[in-house]
């Protein structure tokens, strides 16, 4: 009898402790609001040719290229990507080209989305969009977009609030070296960083291959001009 009671109590505890999707979404909204107003006390500043950014103490860096960096937050790989096309478009011309990940996210149906604005290190307004898309099983594609940057990760839904908090904190510290971007990319007929981004994205998580396949199909249907 005692054993049965113990089992019943355990079931009740486990049932009571389960996290509902509604609760997760509430936690995500709270995390984004907290990150938008948090003091920017950063551990280290990292300077690249095209941009500068700061990392919180708990976030690490795995590898990087000219336009992308893989960060590590809560034992999860996070891709931080500089949107070269947006930088060039603001300076020279409006382009029909769209960063592949941005285009894919825009066409998909999110299970969570929040659009708002915060302030960056220079106290300038920084609009952002946080989106979560279902991938497969318990995995979701978590993304945060600003004017010039796109952060993305593939992880369990329950990690979304923690990852988006770090993404937004870092996004608030980013500064683009526009002159360097123009010097490197404005005279190129083809910008190969899109392919480079997808190659790095493939290293994020086991489910990233499925997302890349979905992006490739989407791009092949004419949604993105390469």
Which functions belong to the PLM regions below?
Residues 2-10:
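Sec-dependent signal peptide recognition
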Residues 13-16:
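C-terminal motif of bacterial Sec signal peptides marking the signal peptidase cleavage site
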Residues 18-21:
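Bacterial signal peptide processing site
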Residues 25-47:
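Post-signal peptide N-terminal segment of mature Sec-exported envelope proteins
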Residues 46-103:
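Secretory pathway targeting signatures of secreted, lumenal, and periplasmic proteins
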Residues 63, 105-109, 174-178:
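Sec/Tat-exported extracytoplasmic proteins
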Residues 105-157, 161, 198-206, 210-217:
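Signature of long, low-cysteine stretches enriched in small and polar/charged residues
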Residues 151-226:
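Surface-exposed amphipathic alpha-helical segments
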């Amino acid at each position: 009898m005692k054993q049965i009671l113990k089992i019943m109590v355990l079931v009740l505890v486990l049932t009571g402790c389960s996290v509902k999707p509604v609760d997760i979404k509430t936690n995500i909204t709270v995390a984004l609001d907290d990150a938008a107003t948090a003091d920017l006390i950063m551990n280290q500043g990292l300077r690249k040719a095209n941009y500068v950014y700061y990392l919180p103490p708990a976030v690490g860096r795995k590898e990087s290229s000219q336009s992308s960096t893989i960060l590590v937050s809560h034992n999860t790989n996070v891709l931080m990507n500089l949107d070269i096309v947006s930088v060039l478009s603001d300076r020279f011309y409006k382009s029909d080209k769209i960063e592949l990940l941005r285009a894919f996210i825009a066409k998909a149906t999110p299970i969570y989305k929040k659009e708002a604005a915060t302030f960056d290190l220079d106290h300038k307004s920084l609009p952002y969009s946080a989106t979560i898309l279902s991938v497969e099983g318990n995995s979701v594609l978590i993304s945060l977009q600003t004017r010039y940057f796109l952060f993305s990760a593939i992880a369990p839904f329950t990690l979304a609030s923690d990852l988006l908090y770090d993404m937004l904190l870092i996004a608030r510290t980013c500064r683009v070296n526009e002159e360097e971007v123009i010097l490197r990319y404005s005279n190129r007929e083809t910008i190969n960083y899109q392919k480079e981004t997808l190659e790095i994205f493939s290293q994020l998580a086991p489910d990233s291959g499925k997302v890349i396949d979905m992006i490739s199909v989407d791009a092949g249907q004419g949604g993105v001009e390469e």
